Amino acid sequence: MLHNLRNEPSKPECRMRTLAIGDIHGCSKALRTLLDAVKPGRDDVLVTLGDYVDRGPDSKGVLDMLIGLETTTNLKPLLGNHEILFLDALNRRIDPEGWLRVGGAETIHSYSPDEPTLAWDKVSPQHVEFLSERCVRYFEDEKNLFVHANANAYFSLNDQSDDWLFWTRFDDSYPHISGKRMICGHTAQKSGWPNVKPHAICLDTWVYGQGWLTCMDVEAGIFVQANQAGAVRDFTLEELADPPTHNTVAIKLPAAPGS
């Protein structure tokens, strides 16, 4: 049986945490709820695994929040394939129509919700700079490899191709030659639960598709999730070994208006 939601999940006193957040996809309500639950501090390393934009309703709001986090925590923002598509479409390196069909229309609309047509000129230059200059291809610590999509098991992160880092599905993951665990997103887990293998964990839990946005306290092995409705739940890595169900997880619902 999973235990009740913790008031401040996985935050022992005086311990720097490494936190990893899966694909956000424009779901700013879920991100705000998750940040309120996890409370990343200045000493915490917060790795966001990419795909901040597209599909969900508020990519602009998500990017505003991420830029704000740069001043309040040690943010390590990774680039995802949807950021690559966004930048390529803005710079006309690809036909924008292809990007618009995979969630780009929602992104542009978030910058100009009252416009009857897509207003490309409303996209924030600050957001473009953040994505193109400050988002990185990968992050690595002593025990873990953080990538958006996947990594070729036989190459260092510095030698990975774009195809592996941004486009290869989690199904094709294998133990890395470094012996480190890989933590990634990209491949939506429509069950709503992280996909855990002995050598890798996928944290994309389909928040834009009525799933959850997941944050993992990497060292403690604790997961906290939030959704667009404002609900929160948490569980441990050990509990995932015995697959949980919606009936065995304590879910904290948002307070009713006026309560």
Each model region followed by its residue ranges:
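N-terminal active-site segment of His-dependent metallophosphoesterases
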Residues: 1-63
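Active-site-proximal beta-strand elements of phosphoester/diester hydrolases
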Residues: 17-25, 144-150, 201-203
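Active-site neighborhood of divalent metal-dependent phosphoester bond hydrolases
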Residues: 55-136, 168-172
